[in-house]
Each structure stands twice: as structure tokens, then as C-alpha cells.
Amino acid sequence: MPLNFETDEQKKCYELLRADVENIVKETGYDELYGHKLTPDDQFYEEVIVDNLIYKFCRANQFEIEGAKSQLKKTLKWRKEFKPLHAAFSETHDSLLNDVCAITVSEENDPNQKVVSWNLYGLLVKHKEVFEDTDKFLRFRIGLMERGLQLLDFASEDNYLMTQVHDYNNVSMWRLDPAIKKCSKAIIEVFQDFYPETLFSKFFVNVPYVMTWLYEIVKRFVSEDTRKKFIVMSDGTQMKDYLKVLPKEYGGEATLNSSKLENIEPNAYVSYLLTQCGGEEPAETTAPEQEKETATA
């Protein structure tokens, strides 16, 4: 991810926040962000990754230092409490949810459209029971997001953002179940608050023209910069104008079910946290000496 600064003030904001990372980790008692270690005390630390992650928080806050610092702190505190890595790799979710949400990867797609998260809400509305427990649905949806983030390379120039597709085929244009609205609102707020600058574009597909409630709900909870990434279309096959590789349901060749990744493996640091620390990552945690020796051999 390129670090671009249009002014000296923007660069200063970044430098101030970058220099304060270790203090923020100590204050929050949590040393993990999107599956990566923030402090340089063992082999899991990758400086260029942390550089780029911190830049995201600056950019998301228009390079205003207090806003960027506050959001980073809140994000780490939330991750410590919510345990999104557990939701992604340790918890078992409703099989129905796994059938209507998917992640695909294609190196043939344009930069930052290689990793795509698919959410088929038109199928979900037939099973309203999955939305009755907001927390349960949220943990599934956040887990899906975290697995997608594992497929990104924050140090690259062409794969440091995700693309999302929300398919509303067969969703009623006149009314939406209150439980679905509640879940949608909760997910939008979490992504806005704790996943800044992780999205390249979001497609709303198979949306009837008169279905204005969709955009009205979403725009209330996201920033102007985020809204600019939204693409709304009435026909899913219109996506061929944006993505080179598509599932058959959207004008491509292979079906979404056959294209989706079934097993996404966590990186070494995430595996360490889940197995050695039980998902908890205090500020002073370091890897075992044996692992350090292996890594430096």
C-alpha cells in the first residue's frame, strides 16, 4: 500500500501516530490488528505492514491526529473484547450462513478487486430466523471479514483492499423485516468504526430502482469517502464492466459455490494467538524462545 501525503501536515499526522503505536498498545493492552502484530519484539512483527495499517487510520480521519488516534484505540479495545479472530477461525456458525456468503480470489481481476466477499441477502431473507440473534449474525459476518483480510497483502500495491458484493435479488422493495434492518445497521456501524480503509468498492446488485430504502439506510452510517465507493446496479450481470472474473450467476463461467474458498488458513501470528494465547494478546506478549530461534535460523 503506497503511503501518499499531499501536504506536510498529513505526513506529520502519520508520523505522530506511528511513533505512538507502542504506547497505544500498552494503554489498550492489545497487540493485534487485522491479524498483524503492532510492536517490534519478536518474529511476528512486520514493520512495513504496521506502517500501512497506521496510514489507514490517518487517511480515514482526514489526517487529523486526535481522530486517528481515538479510532485506533477504540479499534484495539473492541478487538480485545469482541475477539474477531475467534469469530473467524475458532467458532462454528450456522451452516446456512456459510451457504449464502462466500469469499473468492482471482489474480486476474484489477488491483484491489482480487479478494471479493459475496453476501447473498436475497437468499437470507427466506430464513429470517438467522437474523433474530443480532450478536450471532454479527460474529459470523465479522468472521467472514477477518478471513478475507487474511488474503490481503497490506504491503503490496495491488491487494491491500477488499471488494464486497451485496446481492439483493428477491428482497422486497416495499418492506424489510425489522430483525434484518437491525443486523444491517449493526454491521454497517462496526465496519465504519473498526475497519477503516479496508474497502476498495462495494457493489449493491440486483437492486430495484425504487428500492431507495437500501441507500437511505446505508448512507446514514458511513462517511462521504465510503459512500463514493458504493456502486448500485439493478442487474448483477452489469458487474462484468467492473470485474474480469465473475461467478456464473453474474455472467461468468464457474458458479459461486464452486469458486468460493472453503478453508482460509490464518497467518502464523493469528495461529499463535489462537493456540498459545487463547486469542488474548496482552501488550507484552512475545513468542516462545524456541520459536524465535527457529525463525532466525
Curated annotation (Swiss-Prot):
Keyword Heme listed: yes
One Pfam family recorded for the sequence: CRAL_TRIO_N
Gene3D superfamilies: CRAL-TRIO lipid binding domain
GO MF annotation: an example: metal ion binding
Alphabetized InterPro entries for the sequence: CRAL-TRIO_dom, CRAL-TRIO_dom_sf, CRAL/TRIO_N_dom, CRAL/TRIO_N_dom_sf, Sfh5
Enzymatic reactions: a 1,2-diacyl-sn-glycero-3-phospho-(1D-myo-inositol)(in) = a 1,2-diacyl-sn-glycero-3-phospho-(1D-myo-inositol)(out)
Cofactor(s) needed for function: heme b
Binding residues annotated for heme, in chain numbering: Y121, R141, H166, Y168, K202
Domain CRAL-TRIO: 93-258
Location relative to the cell: Cytoplasm; Endoplasmic reticulum membrane; Microsome membrane
Keywords: Cytoplasm, Endoplasmic reticulum, Heme, Iron, Lipid transport, Membrane, Metal-binding, Microsome, Transport
Membrane topology (UniProt): Peripheral membrane protein
GO biological process: Golgi to plasma membrane protein transport; regulation of exocytosis
Gene Ontology CC: cortical endoplasmic reticulum; cytosol; endoplasmic reticulum membrane; plasma membrane
SMART domains membership: SEC14
Top-rank taxon, per record: Eukaryota
Keyword Iron included in the entry's annotation: yes
Record-stated family: Belongs to the SFH5 family.
Role this protein plays: Non-classical phosphatidylinositol (PtdIns) transfer protein (PITP), which exhibits PtdIns-binding/transfer activity in the absence of detectable PtdCho-binding/transfer activity. Regulates PtdIns(4,5)P2 homeostasis at the plasma membrane. Heme-binding protein that may play a role in organic oxidant-induced stress responses.
Protein name: Phosphatidylinositol transfer protein SFH5
Organism of origin: Kluyveromyces lactis (strain ATCC 8585 / CBS 2359 / DSM 70799 / NBRC 1267 / NRRL Y-1140 / WM37) (Yeast)
Lineage: Eukaryota, Fungi, Dikarya, Ascomycota, Saccharomycotina
